[in-house]
C-alpha cells in the first residue's frame, strides 16, 4: 500500500518564504563588514574571531590587500600576558574602505544576500579620513 503525503505533512516548498527571508551572509561578508566598521581604531585577528564568531581570522586582511590592491596599516601590539605580540590592522583612507564596501556589495549581489545599505555605507565612511 502506497502512502500519500497530506499537504500539512509535506515541507512547505513555496518560494514566497525564501523571497521575503534574506539569506544568511557568509563568513567573509561578516568579517569584511566588521573590519570596515572599526574605524580608525582598527581590528585584530582575534577581534574578527570574537565579533564574527569565526574559527580563524588570519587571512581576511591579507586577502583584501591582494584583491583590492590596498595596503592596510599594521601596528604591532604586545599581548596582554606579555608574551609575544599581534598586529592591529587599520584602513588608511575612506577610498580604501569604499573599495571593500564595493566588494561586499558585489559578492552580496552574486550570492543573493543583503548588501550594505547607502545609510550604513555613509556611516562607515564617516569613520575614516578622506586622504
Walk through the language-model features, giving the residues of each.
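Short acidic, hydrophobic short linear motifs in intrinsically disordered regions
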Residues: 39-49
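Amphipathic alpha-helical dimerization/coiled-coil segments
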Residues: 102-131
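DNA-binding patch around the recognition helix
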Residues: 2-25, 61-108
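Short Gly/charged-rich anion-binding patches and loops
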Residues: 30, 59-60
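Short, basic interhelical loop/turn and adjoining N-cap
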Residues: 52-59
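Short amphipathic alpha-helical interface segments
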Residues: 28-40
